[in-house]
């Protein structure tokens, strides 16, 4: 669970245990890199990530790594393909659910658990317009025009990261 808060299982064929361990170390390092880039909760020294974009919502464009730009461009395509059902701009709503879940996990008893109100969710939903995610591929920047908007790249980030990590592993000779 040290990357993307999920289990990663790899089945690979190598000539030796040493080669396998070397390949797995490289693959794990790649996953850690993508996890840090797509993280919405944590800062990392020297890393501009999705949290950095969220922290600058409504303030300024953020210069980002190509791996963030490519993933966000895929997310926009997925938004179009799914008629808006897959929306990385839903972060303000998902953040409310996250906060309530965290509070429930910390609660002494289930009696202390609460659900968000419809008013909270509806207010947050006003800040989920993907058109307010301004990507400038030439400048390599991302700007959230709505200061209350938050990105949550969730499934798109994980899926894209796994695809890129697998391509890199294959290029290193892993089968």
Task: Please annotate each region the language model reported.
Residues 161:
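Residue-level recognition of oxygen-bearing side chains
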Residues 1-154, 164-167:
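A contiguous, well-ordered beta/alpha segment that forms the leading edge of an enzyme domain
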């Amino acid at each position: 669970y040290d990357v993307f808060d999920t289990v990663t299982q790899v089945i690979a064929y190598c000539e030796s245990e040493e080669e396998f361990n070397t390949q797995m170390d490289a693959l794990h390092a790649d996953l850690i890199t993508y996890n840090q880039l797509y993280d919405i909760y944590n800062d990392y020294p020297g890393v501009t990530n999705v949290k950095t974009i969220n922290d600058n919502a409504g303030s300024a464009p953020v210069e980002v790594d190509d791996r963030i730009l490519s993933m966000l461009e895929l997310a926009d395509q997925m938004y179009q393909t799914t008629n808006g059902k897959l929306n990385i701009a839903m972060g303000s709503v998902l953040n409310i659910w996250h906060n309530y879940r965290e509070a429930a996990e910390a609660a002494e008893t289930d009696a202390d658990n609460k659900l968000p109100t419809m008013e909270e969710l509806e207010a947050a939903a006003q800040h989920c317009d993907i058109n307010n995610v301004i990507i400038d591929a030439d400048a390599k920047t991302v700007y959230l025009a709505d200061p209350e908007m938050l990105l949550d790249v969730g499934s798109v980030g994980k899926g894209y990261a796994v695809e890129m990590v697998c391509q890199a592993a294959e290029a290193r000779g892993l089968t």
